[in-house]
Amino acid sequence: VVLLYSGGLDTSVMLKWIQDEYNAEVIALTIDIGQQADDLEVIRKKAIKLGAIKAMVIDAKDEFAEEYISKGIKANASYQGYYHLSTPIGRPLLAKWAVKIAAIEGADTIAHGCTGKGNDQIRLEGTALTLNPDIKIIAPVREWGMGRDEEMEYARKHGIPVRQTASKPYSYDDNMWGVTGEGGEIENPALIPPLKDILQVCSLPEDAPNKPEIVELEFVKGLPVAINGKQMKLANLILALNKIGGKHGVGVTHHIEDRVVGLKVRGLYEAPAAEIIIEAHRNLEKYVSTRMENEFKSEIDIKWGYTVYSGFWYEPYFEHLNAYIDDQNEKVSGTVKVRVIKGRAEAVAVETPNTIFEEKLATFMASTDFNQNASAGFIELYTLQMRLAQRSEKTALLSIGSRENKMKLKKTIHALAKMNYKLYATYKTHKFLAREGIEAILVNKISEESKKPNLKDMLDSNRFDLIINIPSDPDKEERSDKELTDGQVIRQMAVKNNVKMVTSVEVAKELVEKLQAARVKK
């Protein structure tokens, strides 16, 4: 049996358990993918002491960085927020090597330490069976029914050294892209995990240096190639950034997520390099892309994250996602300066030959290429749907002749305002309403074309849902030519636009009462 061996509680217990339960020889396989907190030689020797007939460590750091993490960088790897997928990205590589070593060693079975409640069983077994449909797989944690306490007791009973204790029951998954912590208080979202006891590679943010550090990353076609001007292989660059970011407490995340199997859980993640790189990459990518490209790429990145998290590394659809992502990253070249301090990484400067940023256009500098006078028309069209949607609040035009009629309709107008009617009024009516404390918008006469808002414009654009147009009594008050003209146009446009129009005080009162009754009934 080829056992994917991490040296932790689960795989150490099962190395002994497989020998006893299956009477099988065990080859312990540890893959070096840049573990930050583990001594892999110590782990190899431990496997031999526990009875493995062979224990090997495969150096796959460059393969992991260049063929797996690289895809994640281009896709701004994340799942449901700030989990940068350190474990899911690594699992296909582990499964691939397990199948490969099993073939080399003549083993027909591989084993892993995943539980039946987790996602890793899907990622490892799905990949292994895709690569070799005939491989046998055993998952002792699913079979033996032991919890963490029982495992620690089993380890004590059989003399298996483990670092977990009752007071520190935490388990870890570790690679260069991040460290995942589980167990203890982490599993209960109601508790605050004691970071001082849990963190493996990051300083506590509050204990990190008070002075910020500027990290300059150079990117070529979406991938970082240099730190502060020094060219590096991707694996070495990631490991170097882990030290820088870890010192400043960058990348510590309490993350509640939805597992593939349907459970909602919390993990505690440390991913200093991932946090810095993705912050830089995302900002550079945004800088060289159009708005439409950025919007679509964000959607693709989410799909990428869900696909990897769910264990579908070899799904054909995943190839299509990567094809688009690779194409989009062809122009993502340049340098980004990232400021790191006390748990925070923030891109603060970007330079690239591929930018579509134009300083004169984007700033307050003078420019003949951008016609600012075109903005008014653009805004009117751009906000059309929003403005139309807000017209669900009805509008009413009030043009009421004689003070006597205005006084008679004061309560009626108050009622319209309470029903959220937006009130527009011609000059004398507006003046009366202002004195009575009723809010209304002044509408200028048709003859005053230069003054806005103008009555004719609003009638032409069918802006009113109700018109109360009560002319002055010719026997009591002389009517001007402008009033006669405006009144005539109002009535004509009301008929043309099929707008409710009232020309008498009593009808106006009755109509508003009916509107109130209908509103209450509704």
Predicted feature residues:
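ATP-dependent carboxylate/acyl-activation modules
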Residues: 390-473, 480-500, 508-521
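Short glycine-rich, flexible loops that bind phosphorylated cofactors or substrates
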Residues: 118-119, 474-477
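Internal, active-site/partner-interface "lid" segment
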Residues: 164-182, 476-479, 505-506, 510-511, ...
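Short hydrophobic alpha-helical runs that function as membrane-insertion/retention elements
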Residues: 27-28, 56, 136-138, 163-164, ...
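Short, acidic/small-residue loops that bind anionic groups at enzyme active sites
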Residues: 113-116, 131-144, 487-509
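Structural alpha-beta junctions
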Residues: 52, 132-136, 243-247, 416-423, ...
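Nucleotide-activated chemistry modules centered on ATP-dependent adenylation/adenylyltransferase
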Residues: 1-4, 9-392
